């Protein structure tokens, strides 16, 4: 009897399932040159605004702060600092990402990090019933309700993107 191939679950997927949150999983071929949210949107055939990227910053008072923003927008560090109660925040050095979060560049999910950090989801997420974030592994994404992300991360909506 042939064994059924089992899908490897990430920490993010296990946490979502543990809390009985409905989600949809996406897989795509990735490369080191194509880790951007735009590349993911193109690979999946989904509008760029629904693909959200997870950025990890460091606040002068709070330490690590997680920002989840639309892939087609940029993080406003001043707005994130204000929302998180810091005087300033700066991007976490890439070399520190895995040690801090348990995830690597291109596979960083806001869900299931090593520790729970203050998490801010861009208010733009409220216009969608579901958004897509990294599942915690390159080439894997999960789609779930923005409110579910906030619940799983104890996060909150905030105005944290640059407005053109």
Swiss-Prot record:
CDD domains with a match to the protein in the record: YbaK_deacylase
Database matches in Pfam families: tRNA_edit
Keywords, alphabetical: Lyase, Protein biosynthesis, Transcription, Transcription regulation
Stated role: Affects the expression of the receptor, named binding substance, that mediates mating aggregate formation. Could be a regulatory protein that suppresses the function or expression of ebsA and/or ebsMB.
InterPro entries reported in the protein's UniProt record: Prolyl-tRNA_editing_YbaK/EbsC, YbaK/aa-tRNA-synt-asso_dom_sf, YbaK/aa-tRNA-synth-assoc-dom
Biological process (GO), any one: translation
Species in which this protein is naturally found: Enterococcus faecalis (strain ATCC 700802 / V583)
PANTHER family: CYS-TRNA(PRO)_CYS-TRNA(CYS) DEACYLASE YBAK (PTHR30411:SF0), CYTOPLASMIC PROTEIN (PTHR30411)
UniProt-recorded name of the protein: Putative Cys-tRNA(Pro)/Cys-tRNA(Cys) deacylase EbsC
Taxonomic lineage of the native organism: Bacteria, Bacillati, Bacillota, Bacilli, Lactobacillales
GO molecular function, one term: lyase activity
Protein family according to the UniProt entry: Belongs to the prolyl-tRNA editing family. YbaK/EbsC subfamily.
Database matches in NCBIfam families: YbaK_EbsC
Its EC number(s): 4.2.-.-
């Amino acid at each position: 009897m042939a064994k059924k191939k089992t899908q490897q679950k990430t920490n993010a997927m296990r946490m979502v399932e543990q809390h009985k949150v409905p989600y949809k999983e996406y897989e795509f071929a990735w490369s080191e040159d194509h880790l951007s949210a735009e590349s993911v949107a193109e690979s999946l055939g989904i509008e760029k605004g629904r693909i959200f990227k997870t950025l990890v910053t460091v606040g002068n008072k709070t330490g690590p702060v997680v920002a989840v923003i639309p892939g087609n927008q940029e993080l406003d560090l001043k707005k994130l600092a204000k929302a998180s109660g810091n005087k300033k925040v700066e991007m976490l050095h890439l070399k520190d990402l895995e040690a801090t979060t348990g995830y690597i560049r291109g596979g960083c999910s806001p869900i299931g990090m090593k520790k729970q950090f203050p998490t801010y989801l861009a208010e733009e997420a409220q216009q969608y019933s579901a958004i897509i974030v990294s599942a915690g592994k390159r080439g894997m994404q999960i789609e779930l309700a923005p409110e579910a992300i906030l619940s799983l991360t104890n996060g909150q909506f905030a105005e944290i993107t640059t407005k053109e």
